[in-house]
Amino acid sequence: VLCPGLQIDFVDEKKSEKVKWLYEDGLNSYLIESSSDIDLLIDESIICSKSTDTQEVEFAINWSKNIRKDLLNETYVNLIPTPQGGSHFNGFKSGLLDALKEFCEYRNLLPKGLKLVADDIVSNSIFVVSSKLQNPQFAGQTKERLDSKDHMSFVSSVTKDTLSIW
């Protein structure tokens, strides 16, 4: 998933079964496969990949037209799953919120008194966020949550810019 073009072949000799995993386009291929039974809001998922000398973020996102609890929501840091999210996920949500707020305010789409919050935007979304950075700081030994504050602003900025252009 996080290494586009990498093929993994698993052979279960006891059951004489073979399974092949290959995501030619990385996150996009994974998102398409994972959402094959979902009625998506937009035809093509929003895909982004941005890197600097010290950090990188890649994400793919789409939304389900129907309320579902079983949607793919995954985050990674340096190929390590981060089920509790952390600063990269918070930056992603912040960027989504900023872009949507900007869009709605510019077009006067928000009713007076209605306040958007990030959780509303991601609540029915299907996404994968993958970050790579030097010397990541994790909260705890299990590496379930990233705690690198500088990376949050990078991810937020990249996410907002990507959605603003989209």
Q: At which residue positions do the language-model features occur?
A:
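Long, charged, helix-prone linker segments
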Residues: 15, 148-149
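GHKL/Histidine-kinase-like ATPase module
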Residues: 2-143
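Flexible helix-coil linker/hinge segments at domain or subdomain boundaries
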Residues: 150-166
